[in-house]
């Protein structure tokens, strides 16, 4: 006993439309492609977040960390005040007051 695909015919005025029901499931390749694409997006998101944190840490280290302290010490040894104009009053030194 063989079954053939079911066709539905609709006739209105002068138009005849024949519709055949589609397959109920997609091929597994569609699911695999969707999963691989979402994994790729997730990996790229992780890389971007790690890069952002790395750049932020470099900024903080150069602004407030050891590098900034060395720059301040070198500037004080040379007698230069970093980021200040000549007319401003003296600023707080990084050294302990006497």
UniProtKB/Swiss-Prot annotation:
Record keywords, A-Z: Host membrane, Membrane, Transmembrane, Transmembrane helix
Localization, UniProt: Host membrane
Mode of membrane association: Single-pass membrane protein
Disulfide links within the chain: none
Comp. bias intervals (Low complexity): 1-21
Cellular component terms (Gene Ontology): host cell membrane; membrane
Transmembrane annotation, as ranges: 29-49
Name by which UniProt lists this protein: Uncharacterized gene 28 protein
Species of the source: Equine herpesvirus 2 (strain 86/87) (EHV-2)
Gene name of this polypeptide: 28
């Amino acid at each position: 006993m063989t079954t053939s695909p079911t066709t539905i015919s609709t006739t209105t005025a002068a138009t005849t439309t024949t519709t055949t029901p589609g397959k109920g499931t997609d091929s597994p390749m569609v699911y695999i492609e969707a999963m691989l694409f979402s994994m790729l997006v997730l990996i790229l998101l992780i890389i971007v977040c790690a890069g952002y944190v790395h750049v932020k840490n470099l900024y903080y280290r150069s602004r407030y960390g050891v590098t900034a302290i060395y720059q301040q010490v070198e500037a004080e040894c040379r007698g230069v005040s970093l980021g200040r104009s000549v007319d401003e009053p003296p600023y707080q030194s990084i050294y302990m007051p006497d």
